Amino acid sequence: MTTAAIVLAAGGGSRFIASGGEGHKLLATYLGRTVVEWAIENAAAAHLDATYVVRGATDLPLPPLAVDAVQFVRNDRWADGIATSMQAGITRARRDGHAAVVVGLGDQPLVQTEAWRRVARTTRSPVAVATYEGVRGNPVRLSSMVWPLLPNTGDAGARIVMRRRPDLVTEVPCPGRSADIDTVDDLAEWS
């Protein structure tokens, strides 16, 4: 059974711009690199069977170390919510024959490679979610069994399945943080 990593990085980043940010939040500098470079590199370094980056609102640079390991998936419906990006990534994973995906966000540079690995290895239930000090976050592993339960549009993804079917979920304690960089203040706080 093969598993693909999916980094969702298609949104418009409107909250960052509204908070005074210049340009897209994913392209903001965080500890010497862009926010999205950290997220992609951490996912790719987990060495799952494939790594997909879903993009839409902006073109994204690839980190130098991940160029050979990453494939872009285009989501032209990114404005219809994060669920469309998840569906775009899952469609690609299904086409490529993967039986599960581990999904994370491009604006979460503090999610460590070890979190991607731990969640990917947790296969005793159809859904595995990273926890940080007992709080659920990203990434989330989704077996193909639950893909039909995911929404097609809107700003919710795996949370809907976890809320409706808690019996399918295993929590996985992970190092790091699942903090989003949504505003200029977030960027300053975590830098």
List PLM regions with ranges.
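Conserved alpha/beta core of the MobA/IspD/sugar-nucleotide pyrophosphorylase nucleotidyltransferase superfamily
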Residues: 1, 5, 148, 153-191
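Short glycine- and hydrophobic/aromatic-rich loop-to-beta-strand nucleating segment
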Residues: 138-142, 179-181
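Nucleotide and nucleotide-moiety/phosphate-recognizing core
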Residues: 2-136, 144, 149, 166-175
